[in-house]
């Protein structure tokens, strides 16, 4: 790998951090707006559910997301503040269907200590000001003028230092905040302040409340007519206002999120740390509060946000499990729950650990993650591409084409599968045992190759061969009519739909027929300048059985043309360029947009937007799908039409957000595909591969596939052992009932195909699993699982005791073979030259696997070690080199010296980085992630002139990822095909707290320089949402310094080139002096890295 790295997201963040509801896209439209840390999604509430409208990246980690409506506005605006102290106000532009920036700014202060409890951003309900609590002891005010525009910000001193929450109160003549804080004796109180915009200061507020519940952590301001505030504690809930005080006890719980149900604020939904959803009701007589009631509704994912939508629909956003759309029912179900889950939205966060495995054994990596937390813990199997689930298969050599036919026009299912060979045609059908067997359609000519078949109107079937077109009854299967090719000519290309047939005979002759009841009419004939290579009349206009236009691909001038039907007049001619002929053309419609797809003989695909009214072709784009000729066919899955491109690299073409996407199919070469929708296997596909025909159903159409294995407990570490086909986990189960020991820790063994627990080893009380490894030792052919643990005692700051456990898998059971006590937590385990390397608190320890003195079994024996770390948390090895990521002392490089049998330090990075993960890219370059969401690389300086130079790891790359990385692993999510340009590029995968799976690819220097130039040009063309700067966002940032990113490129920005309109692509092409086609090809190739 190299110094020049490309960072790209394979799976976007899914951890929902904020959500809000309001009329953002229109005065009458109700929107749910969701923040996923560095992205926002805008949804529209429709009778059918939530409809996505926009999903955009934000160049910052979102700290505040609030809707508000200044005076004189008919719809809401969106206020966003980021963790790096930028803010913006966004407005919906209905014309362009995108967000525009109303205001933006920077609210950082030169001095000031960032708050420990996170940033707070709030908006006065009467839109007089925005309040921000970003630094201890300061409250920042951004006032509005009377036109709703923002004025200059100022700070007010806030004497409460340990602030837990701040909200604006409703119904106050002057803007008033309520502050929940903790004093230096750990008691909690609430205070109110009026904000005087004139004096730029606080005035004592109308009331205060001292000595609340010790767990009070959340304020909920109550709107008029009641006003006042709810204070949510761990054991009590209090309603407080200038005139009233009401309190009720609750079962001990930590409330994580709330959502207001009614506009008058009399009912609230509360979500706690166990995922229990309660309804809190304020009882009142007119405007006088009489009491509080709380009722358990049921269980959801552990909520980080709750947004009440409408008509009892509620969005539950989660950071520890899947987010949900739920409905609250008036009557409980059989389990007593009022909560009904309607939709689940996958969330991989937090990814605490993962491993890369090839479970299908087909050369493609899958990532198995430890995802979620507490009761929502799960394993997720993530793989790229679309799988085909095989239902039936038969051995057949030399298939030249396939079509499915029905036995009647209105039959919902297909009956026949016509399979064409070089000198015959066979007809297959499903028998009663759901097996494929051969049958006959008497009216078909089975002694010759079929060029095309189709269902036709009036319960007919049409078969085109080289010398005729046959029209056959689908009920009696008899021949009804036949059209013969003129003497001396034979048909070489043909296509048909339910009412039309278009065919080409040699010499550029084009013949158009129409199908009647028992008749074939030759309607029109035309002579073209060159031979015809491919045809399509797939009806995508108003009439599902008739097309007004035909697409024709030509030899010699290498063009694609659009002709009118029935008169065969030329409407459009598009030169394709190059020397490779079009092999397959297809007109299709995705999300209401008509396209012409044109596949070439060398694996390239062109797509154009096709105007149905004028036949015009625009917005030309070219991608490389494979290296062999491609054939295109449409198919349906879940009531949506997609296109299957069969070739040496089969691909499904689909559309999302009106953009064409390409997802590889997990099959080796496919020569032909056709939909085969039979009753036994609905929505199936027939697929011809080398020597066999397979019938199978297709996965959901998306780029990444995620399978969930709910565990009901939190998996913290995972390892795979290929020899035993198992996974081993370190996991923790949280029990609510048993208060003495709320956590139980286990080592669990899972089958790698079924993912069922097959064996469990419970750890001791207070013992945590910290690390896990599958390895073998010198002079021992067995494969073992080694587990590193720590005893976490309540009274100790740092564990002083742990164990290393060595297990073998026998008959699907974990057998403990050896254990070794340690003087601290075993944070990391690595296989090292046939020995075991452990990181234990501040030291690195090497163990050998040796026979015991009694000569019987084996044990771990200490060989040597190395002190000198604060806490050695992350370790990677390569050869004799050991790279250590320290709690706070960045990265150091150690070496094991065989002769002396000792480990010594060779070099270190002298910066203070608090590490979260490390990986070795190559002999000299090491990658690190740290707790300010940055990535960096360091280089070993073996050529240094002095010892001092050689002892320093030089920082060579820096980048702000904006994500907390928990683990790096070498590997790839995609099939590595040696013939592709990216086949040789080494990659590292990472997993983050927000559920991001990312890829870091090391590039050759010339490619890096080219892409760096492209990135610079893209920054000028693509502006960040809210005016946020991409350059600032990607700059390495911690408490001590901010420096521009270097030797890292943002793949997400680079790949967004493919979403640009043609004229913006041309703008970039001009600036780079590189043709658009070339830019698209180079960026397309990169998308194949993930």
From Swiss-Prot:
Q: Does the keyword Lipid biosynthesis apply?
A: no
Q: Which pathway is this protein engaged in?
A: Protein modification; protein ubiquitination
Which InterPro entries does the entry mention? Beta-prop_RSE1/DDB1/CPSF1_1st, Cleavage/polyA-sp_fac_asu_C, Quinoprotein_ADH-like_sf, RSE1/DDB1/CFT1/CPSF1, WD40/YVTN_repeat-like_dom_sf
Write down the superkingdom of origin: Eukaryota
Q: Which GO cellular component terms are attached?
A: nucleus
Q: Which UniProt keywords apply?
A: Nucleus, Phytochrome signaling pathway
| Outcome of swapping residue 311 to Y | In hp1; induces exaggerated light responsiveness
Q: What is its main location?
A: nucleus
* An annotated Gene Ontology molecular function: nucleic acid binding
Name its cellular compartments.
Nucleus
One Gene Ontology BP term is:
protein ubiquitination
| Stated family | Belongs to the DDB1 family.
Provide the function of this protein: Component of light signal transduction machinery. Involved in fruit pigmentation and fruit nutritional quality. Acts as a negative regulator of fruit pigmentation. Probably acts by participating in the CDD complex, a complex probably required to regulate the activity of ubiquitin conjugating enzymes. Repression of photomorphogenesis is probably mediated by ubiquitination and subsequent degradation of photomorphogenesis-promoting factors such as HY5.
Q: Which PANTHER family match?
A: DNA REPAIR/RNA PROCESSING CPSF FAMILY
**Assembly and binders:** Probable component of the CDD complex, which probably also contains DET1.
Task: Supply any other comment.
Answer: The hp1 variant was originally discovered as a spontaneous mutant at the Campbell Soup company farms (Riverton, N.J.).
What is the designated name of this protein?
DNA damage-binding protein 1
What is the scientific name of the source organism? Solanum lycopersicum
Gene name linked to the record: DDB1
